[in-house]
A protein has these predicted regions:
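Sec-dependent bacterial lipoprotein signal peptides
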Residues: 2-33
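Sequence-level preference for short, compositionally simple segments enriched
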Residues: 40-42, 80, 86, 165, ...
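Low-complexity, acidic/polar, glycine-enriched regions of mature
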Residues: 54, 74-75, 79, 91, ...
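Tryptophan-anchored aromatic micro-motifs
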Residues: 55-67
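Central antiparallel beta-sheet cores of small beta-barrel/beta-sandwich binding domains
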Residues: 64, 68-154
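A charged, solvent-exposed segment within the mature domains of Sec-exported extracytoplasmic proteins
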Residues: 135-186
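Glycine-rich, aromatic-bearing surface loops/beta-hairpins
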Residues: 164-215
């Protein structure tokens, strides 16, 4: 897998530094209180269309996304070209990013379908160079939820943040991604992404990643 550019994390690292004091105070105030789960993915079993992760991301697709801080302020925008190659139950997904400040970055996910549990949830595991350990989660209905820790470089130290990542398929060619970013169990921001694939993306792919659009 290709190694994601370290500079890609600098913006999120700066945000975490700004939030660190607030987070520390809140963490002390909330010490001993367990965070509640966001939702039970099993409750989405009847939602349609059914998401098959490796099939949705096989081939060429594009995405548009934003990052907001915990107060809902827009901090960054980005666009992505994606290319997925499917080999049995394994998907290798290449992502190429352009951010609105001109920064370029890349990530390669290796995603394995592990099987289906007795509850009907299809289990997945994903690995990428900048993800600590492996992303773990499941799919049912039109939704996937997986969680993972990403290590960010800050002042020469590695700082872990947690991602609670949800994907909801809307129709054959559209899915919406919401990822909640937290530190010490306290949410510090969120990512929203719209994925476009298939015929809907045919007139868009590849997006220009030379520079951010000016008009």
């Amino acid at each position: 897998m290709r190694r994601t550019h370290r500079r890609k994390h600098s913006w999120l690292g700066r945000l975490i530094v700004k939030c660190f004091v607030v987070v520390s105070v809140l963490a002390g105030a909330l010490f001993g209180i367990s965070a509640c789960a966001r939702k039970d993915i099993g409750a989405l079993s009847g939602n349609q269309p059914r998401l098959v992760l490796e099939e949705f991301f096989a081939g060429k697709s594009v995405a548009y996304g934003i990052f907001e801080d915990r107060f809902g302020n827009l901090r960054r925008q980005f666009r992505v070209n994606l290319n997925g190659n499917l080999d049995g139950n394994r998907l290798v997904l290449d992502e190429e990013f352009l951010y609105d400040d001109g920064e370029r970055a890349s990530r390669t996910w290796t995603i394995d379908r592990l099987g289906t549990g007795t509850n009907g949830i299809v289990m997945y595991q994903g690995r990428a160079a900048d993800v600590a350990m492996a992303a773990q989660g499941g799919q049912i209905g039109n939704a996937l939820n997986w969680q993972y820790d990403m290590t960010l470089e800050m002042s020469g130290m590695g700082v872990d943040v947690h991602f609670d990542d949800w994907i909801y398929q809307q129709d054959e060619d559209i899915a919406i991604n919401r990822a909640y970013v937290s530190k010490f169990g306290i949410e510090i921001g969120s990512v929203t992404i719209v994925f476009i694939r298939g015929d809907t993306a045919s007139d868009l792919w590849p997006l220009s990643l030379d520079q951010w659009p000016n008009s």
